[in-house]
Amino acid sequence: MPSATTILSDLPDDVRLHRLEALVVASETLQRASGLDDILHAILDLVSNQLDCERATVFLRDRRTGRLHARQVTGSTPLDIVLEKGVGVAGFVAETGENVLINDVRSDPRFDPSTDRRTGFLTRNMLCVPLRKPEGTVMGSLQAINSRHGDFSDADLAYLASFGALAAIAVEREQLAQEAVRAQLLSTELELARKIQQRLLPPPGRLDLPAPFSAWGASQACYDVGGDTYDVVMLSSGECGFWVADVSGKGIGAALLMTTLQTELRALIRMERDLARLASELNTRVTTVAPLGTYATLFLGVLSADKGRLRFVNAGHLPPVWAKGQAASPTEFEASGMPIGLLPGSFYEAGETEFPKGERLALFSDGVTDAENTSGETFEPAGVINAHAGIRTHEVEQIGPAFFEELDRFRIGAPAKDDTTYLVIGLD
């Protein structure tokens, strides 16, 4: 079609001057407008006034679904209009990027009369142009409906296209500004979530426990927040309770479930001595709040210094390893139940074993065993055992850092793909 400048030159001088002045005013108005709704309202007021039409509409594309949503409509009460991809004139324009002028909509197959039927409005003629980003992507469409002076002209269409170009720039600018605000809010929320998590987890390093217990732990989140958790608590019985849990998934969702899990565990371990019943109750509580398909593996132990015995329950978690230097070896603490939160009504079996004085037990999440090096090889449970076998000290505050050094040496600079949690428990 001819350019806007060419068509404007065909208009009478007074009309041409008026329209050019209106475009300048439109540009200034859109630069001053703040907020997407204000920008869209300003666009439609300008279109309605300059083209003297009964109704004007801005449609914006939903980037997720591809549907068009009528964000602003003039000449009526706000309408909830949603168009599937390619439906109606607005949908056609958004898909093809073409400018459309129709002076008899009933004779044009692109026109969709369903909105008229819903509202009682009678559409006679219309103009529709794409809202195009600077790089060419169409973000929506701009419509002018029912000229009050008869038919729309090519000059009207070119004029609306000029408004559409200004509107697209303003909308794109505002959407980018909104995305920046959302990103900042998300960053703030992530930082808050990270701080909350840090308060729920023990501080990394040696944990403050009465003799003869000792422990060292650390958890490194793959993202700003993680789904792994661990803790060590002294019980009124004089026993030492401890656990490592790994929530499925990563990021905010996993962190929320981790928070629930940590809070519930701290309460239940002080109320319920039977670890099988404790795990069942924990599973019940978690399944009521966790989204479907979200779960956590868990190894939970209670160590008695007087008896030299360890009671434990394993809910789908990796078995720990004995971590005393050259005597490092796998344990037989295999899973005795489903992961926590996976299935309502799950039952668990508790186990018990000897825990000699001087022994060390290492617990870890699958971020350890699944760690990859630059060749794509994984650390595996065997890597955990071999790493401990090479550590010559028996002090937990030295075992922990030495183990992470071995893990980092294996990775050779490859980035972590999952949260990494490690806890070593000792009885002296």
Describe the predicted segments one by one.
Residues 1-38, 139:
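Signal-transmission linkers at sensory-effector interfaces
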Residues 6-8, 73-76, 141-150, 171, ...:
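Short beta-strand-to-loop transition segments that serve as allosteric relay/switch motifs
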Residues 22, 134, 151-175, 259-263, ...:
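Amphipathic alpha-helical "output/dimerization" segments
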Residues 45-48, 55-81, 85, 106-107, ...:
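GAF sensory/regulatory domain recognition
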Residues 67, 76-78, 103-125, 146-148, ...:
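Signal-transducing coupling segments at domain and membrane junctions
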Residues 77-100, 105, 333-336:
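Acidic/proline- and glycine-rich, intrinsically disordered low-complexity segments
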Residues 124-135:
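A short, aliphatic-rich beta-strand micro-motif
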Residues 177, 181-362, 409-428:
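… and, occasionally, acidic/histidine-rich disordered N-termini of signaling adaptors
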